[in-house]
Amino acid sequence: MALLQIAEPGQAAAPHQHRLAVGIDLGTTNSLVASVRSGQSVILNDEQERSLVPSVVHYGVEEKKVGLEAFEQASLDPKNTVISVKRLIGRSLSDVQSRYSSLPYEFVASENGLPLIITAQGAKSPIEVSSDILSRLNHIAEQRLGGELSGVVITVPAYFDDAQRQSTKDAARLAGLNVLRLLNEPTAAALAYGLDSGQEGIIAVYDLGGGTFDISILRLSKGIFEVLATGGDTALGGDDFDHLIADWVIEQTKLKPQTANQQRELITLANQAKITLTNEKSAVISWQDFSVEISREQFNELIYPLVKRSLLTCRRALKDANVESEEVQAVVMVGGSTRVPYVREQVGEFFGKTPLTSIDPDKVVALGAAIQADILVGNKTDSDMLLLDVVPLSLGIETMGGLVEKIIPRNTTIPVARAQEFTTFKDGQTAMTVHVLQGERELVDDCRSLGRFTLRGIPPMAAGAAHIRVTYQVDADGLLSVTAMEKSTKVQASIQIKPSYGLTDEEVTAMIKSSFDNAQEDLQARELAEQRVEADRVIESVIVALQADGAELLSTDEFHHIETVLKQLMDVKQGSDRDAIAQGIKALDTATQEFAARRMNASINKALTGKNLSDIENP
């Protein structure tokens, strides 16, 4: 079945009308555009028959250049040539400056703390730079296809968070593109291989591009593409290999770049050496009157820690998917950096099988995105292909005691909507704050806050009487909306989560790892917090009851006894002995049982006062 068919309301799509749609791989280093033509997904080349468009924009005094022409300006005018903008999109200025301090650009902060790059054509945001790249790809597509595009599918790393995804959509809209869907890059690759090779079973997609790394474990069965688990690193890629070679050259020559131009020149030479080492045993780097030779073995030693880091992420993804490495039937290699022989060798050893490389790793993502775009505009209405992406980190809500109640667990298939009912804690409560959280831990302090909103207008009721339905909805692009509704009045409030900046790769890794490392401690902390919440509830109800009926229904000794036990529970609640708190709750319950019975009898007597038997039998 098709995921979506687009037609005007009340109208059916013309049976033989072919809509123009493309898939775009908006990469860190290079970008590509593809489309389905005559039933086959193909890359659309530019005017010079080049398939790869460098993800580079040069903002000169008089003109703007995008692609290879811009890349050629990188060493001549680095301050006005923006490369690897994908690393910057959706991040705060402080994050960019701390992580990428060696960038040659001059940054200023926007009103909301996002980075703006100072260029000869004014301040440019990462969204604007990305938009210029997308505009170039749009131009190539429309020139090749001979018409205006109906829509596009743009791929993003699986670990892009809400801010990074939303920024990508904003860039596309700024370029005048109709975004049909954002698609995870590994999922797009699986789609391309599933169509071309008819693969079924468990597949690992190892995606190492210029600036990001992703691993996805997928199950392909009878046309259904299901992502079982994902992992990734938003700051690991071929660019890092280049920097390692550059650092090695500096160490060998004892010469550091003195200018931005020299830095860019050295990085370019390092990149060329990396490419040479893909096919040759060694490469010569000539820089500042020095000539040094680096062997493939030396290069392998340099990149070993980064490759190992990627394989540790693979191990975590397999664990999340509850899959053993020997169950993986095929390993798909995606991204230009997977051409490095050492990467292929190590990945093959890890999974115990030779990786698949039959589709060009630079092109496979764009080809898969084009297939999905063709489905989404209704060109392939008989398709039985279904794509199921997943939520990479759990989404939850804060409950009393600083606890996190998970609404959508990590690795849940999207799009998804989940609802859960909550209630008020105090009598007469007319408002409730909904605190949206992301992460794997049990306590609020250990998770990431995504946002808060307040539901007002709850009718005053006894504690626990109100019914608040909270719905979490994640769309196909991974964007989250949360709605809270009081069921009797239908009053509601909502929020759409668009964080001002994204998670760093360290935070993503730490959030997942800490959930394993602290599982036992978290469980104990949760149980303690739950006991404290229960103690607070009991204390609150007893205090209210004493104030209302204590003087009338209790003797002085009984009143003082309950007060004493109540005070003991209030004291023990401040400690960290969960069993002691439970015993205190039980003791207070025992001490107030007779009081509770008297209150019940008094309520019944009050309700029956002045009524006869016939009134009760015939209300």
UniProtKB/Swiss-Prot annotation:
InterPro entries: ATPase_NBD, Heat_shock_70_CS, HscA_NBD, HSP70_C_sf, HSP70_peptide-bd_sf, Hsp_70_fam, ISC_FeS_clus_asmbl_HscA. One of its GO terms (cellular component) is cytosol. Pfam families: HSP70. One of its GO terms (molecular function) is ATP binding. Keywords: ATP-binding, Chaperone, Nucleotide-binding. One of its GO terms (biological process) is iron-sulfur cluster assembly. NCBIfam families: HscA, PRK05183.1. Chaperone involved in the maturation of iron-sulfur cluster-containing proteins. Has a low intrinsic ATPase activity which is markedly stimulated by HscB. Belongs to the heat shock protein 70 family. This is Chaperone protein HscA homolog. It comes from Haemophilus influenzae (strain ATCC 51907 / DSM 11121 / KW20 / Rd).
